[in-house]
């Protein structure tokens, strides 16, 4: 998925080189559970795959996120979005992510890696006090078991490798290559059974809402 427009021509050559250098470093030595997807034709459109952290409702999911650099980057923070549907207090319906690092706590020297690690941490420790999804924030504070069940259901429906077109972040293929197709083939029967079960569970939950 590419951005509708690009700010690449508005960034200084120095900023472009700095961003590409950082992306290439992350591609060579990726942070744990994060795989950056480099778009060499447009460094203002950055995408990455984040593993759902163990012990959270997002565990076993793979979430695609997008950072869009504006013309004033790094003086101003990028916009961050989940492209994978997720039930989370700090993620709006359009996928926009609310985190202080990208607002009042932004510093020009933080870098792309720091942003992606912050987003991963947000999956571990949501902040219901600054919720973009008020329903999720309220549910987390008042009925955590219901919140966890809903978030887990969304993860199982939308954040599976077959949905993202990837295997795992360690060997992800963004181009639908052989390993992706092999993985998808092995998982197809399991995915079909899981889908039936999840649809039934979803219908039951919707009746209660």
Curated annotation (Swiss-Prot):
Record: active site: 98
A Gene Ontology molecular function term of the record: ATP binding
Enzyme Commission designation: 2.3.2.23
Superkingdom field: Eukaryota
Start and end residues of each UBC core domain: 14-160
GO biological process terms, semicolon-separated: anaphase-promoting complex-dependent catabolic process; cell division; exit from mitosis; protein ubiquitination
Annotated region (Disordered), positions in chain: 165-209
Biased composition, class Basic residues, residue ranges: 200-209
Keywords on record: ATP-binding, Cell cycle, Cell division, Nucleotide-binding, Transferase, Ubl conjugation pathway
Catalytic activity entry: S-ubiquitinyl-[E1 ubiquitin-activating enzyme]-L-cysteine + [E2 ubiquitin-conjugating enzyme]-L-cysteine = [E1 ubiquitin-activating enzyme]-L-cysteine + S-ubiquitinyl-[E2 ubiquitin-conjugating enzyme]-L-cysteine
Entry-linked Pfam families: UQ_con (PF00179)
InterPro entries: Ub_conjugating_enzyme, UBQ-conjugat_E2_core, UBQ-conjugating_AS, UBQ-conjugating_enzyme/RWD
Biased composition regions of type Basic and acidic residues, renumbered to the chain: 184-199
Pathway linked to the protein: Protein modification; protein ubiquitination
Family: Belongs to the ubiquitin-conjugating enzyme family.
Function statement: Catalyzes the covalent attachment of ubiquitin to other proteins. Acts as an essential factor of the anaphase promoting complex/cyclosome (APC/C), a cell cycle-regulated ubiquitin ligase that controls progression through mitosis. Acts by specifically elongating polyubiquitin chains initiated by the E2 enzyme vih/UbcH10 on APC/C substrates, enhancing the degradation of APC/C substrates by the proteasome and promoting mitotic exit.
Identification of the protein by name: Ubiquitin-conjugating enzyme E2 S
